[in-house]
Amino acid sequence: MAWEVQGILSVRQGDGIYLVRQADPAESVQELIKRRQRLPEILEAREAIEVKIASLAAQRRTEEDMDAIDAALDKMAAEVAAGEHGYDGDMTFHAAVTSAARNPILTGLMDLLAESIEETRRESLSQPGRPLLSLASHRSIAKAIRRGDPASAARAARRHITLVADVALLTLESKHGA
């Protein structure tokens, strides 16, 4: 899973595992250590920002915003149904929700964190069964936004970040005290 996140392997459900590039063992170990240290901090930042974004989106969204959110959910569902991880649909969903919040400062913060968020996205969605769970989590957020319920949208976003945070790399750290 970690090698997929690093772009070394490509896993295609039902098709196999493909080598994308050769790994430098020293680089891989160092990157794994850095990632394990960095992920909790990224997830804390995501929770602080994305919970507020979901709440604002529920208050400010338009029908066009809901169309974009629904299209992102459909895209992720199609990717997952095709045996993919749903990376593009996931990214599109978060961008649509951020846009619906109508706050250029928060949009800028999300843009600044984009590379780090991509790291957590790939780590999370590469976990077995995770794409379907993430899609269901996104649907809960979208439902609350559609209802115009900021408190429910915030709770759903917080649950989503908790789901994203449950990754093997961090579980390994807590089990082994590394």
Residue ranges of predicted features:
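Short coil/turn segments at secondary-structure junctions
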Residues: 30-37, 77, 81, 125
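C-terminal effector-binding regulatory domain of bacterial HTH transcription factors
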Residues: 150-178
